[in-house]
A protein has these predicted regions:
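Terminal, compositionally biased non-globular sequences in eukaryotic proteins
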Residues: 7, 13, 19-285
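Short terminal hydrophobic/aromatic SLiMs and anchors at protein ends
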Residues: 2, 15-16
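Extreme N-terminal basic, low-complexity initiation segments
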Residues: 2-8
Length: 285
């Protein structure tokens, strides 16, 4: 067939076969990138907790525009950890406690699943709040992971506030009564010598000394390692050097029984130990 001009007539209708095929490939590629896939959101009943306590809430999983095979839903506590490597130091986010909430299941398009949970907080979890104020340098969050088969994982992160145990408050109160002031806190990878420790890191809370101790102490670092029955307390003192001597660190540790913690005058005990430490080479109590 030819047109009036003599040129062959070209059919303007496209062959949709290749176009449909390209669309399917593009759609699969977008699904693999997570576009149009499921979403996840965690709702905490209360973001405040204590070491050895728990967090409660639920995870909402919402289906996307296509059916999705979910491998599992899990939650975990994450914090920022300082790592020393040779002569360098860097920080990284580390998950230190994890709980799976589901096994595998198929999530239909537009479907909504609500998964309740009760998450145990490890005893050695670093504290992030003191007297209603955030501890400078600390980060803590509950991360939620939705593992998607053959696609990009989905996640959510919610801030968590970890408050001190009553026994920890006793020690903190004593230091503040002695005039020590909070400087900052961080979490360091490693283990503290001579204590029972499960997690691969420990928290250091740093204090400025008051005038009464400033002549012998540059800085005080406090570490708590709680267990179900006893609070392990570790002190590190950065001692000032003298006219003919160099400064150095002194260490000490002691245990606090939860049942009898409120029967001890910790301000008096700490004052005695701190003054003795400033006058001798080592500190062992």
């Amino acid at each position: 067939m030819s047109g009036k001009s003599g040129w062959p007539v070209v059919d303007n209708l496209h062959d949709n076969t290749s176009e449909k095929g390209s669309h399917v490939v593009f759609k699969r590629m977008m699904q693999a990138m997570g576009v149009g896939g499921p979403s996840v959101e965690t709702v905490l009943a209360n973001p405040n907790c204590r070491p050895g306590g728990y967090l409660e809430g639920h995870v909402q999983v919402m289906g996307g525009d296509h059916a999705t095979d979910i491998e599992y839903v899990a939650i975990g506590l994450i914090t920022r950890v300082e790592v020393e490597s040779g002569d360098s130091e860097y920080s990284s986010d580390q998950e230190f406690h994890r709980q799976r909430l589901t096994g595998s299941f198929r999530l239909d398009p537009g479907a909504r699943h609500e998964i309740p949970f009760r998450f145990d907080v490890p005893w050695e979890t670093p504290i992030t709040e003191v007297y209603g104020q955030h501890l400078h340098g600390m980060t803590m969050g509950l991360t939620t992971e939705l593992e998607v088969a053959r696609a990009v994982d989905k996640s959510d992160l919610d801030a968590v506030a970890v408050h001190p145990l009553p026994a920890q408050e006793q020690i903190l109160d004593a230091l503040l009564r002695l005039g020590f002031r909070f400087s900052r806190a961080d979490v360091e990878r490693g283990h503290v010598y001579g204590v029972q420790q499960q997690l691969p890191f420990y928290q250091e809370i740093e204090f400025y000394p008051p005038a009464a101790y400033a002549g012998g102490i540059n800085q005080l670092e406090l570490t708590f390692i709680p267990t179900p029955h006893t609070l392990q307390v570790v002190l590190e003192i950065d001692k000032r050097g003298g006219l003919f001597t160099e400064g150095h660190d002194a260490f000490g540790s002691f245990n606090v029984d939860y049942a009898t913690a409120d029967r001890t005058d910790w301000a008096r005990e700490l004052d005695t130990w701190l003054r003795q430490s400033a006058q001798r080479r080592g500190l062992f109590f």
